[in-house]
């Protein structure tokens, strides 16, 4: 069975995340590379409202997720190799540093993102 890595922050879980994870699970054993709090602060400019350990617990409760590991914002091929992963699965807003032959992209779910939810909730 292929080992699939899906990187995400999960600052606000929504149905687009679940759909991506379901598609990833069709390809093999799914490990979520979950962005650490400090990286979210560095890249997005805010501390996540749900801290890493709680986001990890949420991710592990999703039936498509087999494991969760911490990660920085960008994933590179060395990260895949260090964790014995075959493929990186990502939405088509891909910005990582993994070669195309080890990447599977899926279209994002239209009309939803954590940023949109955050904007609706806090503005």
Residue ranges and their predicted role:
Residues 1-123:
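Nucleotidyltransferase catalytic core that binds NTPs
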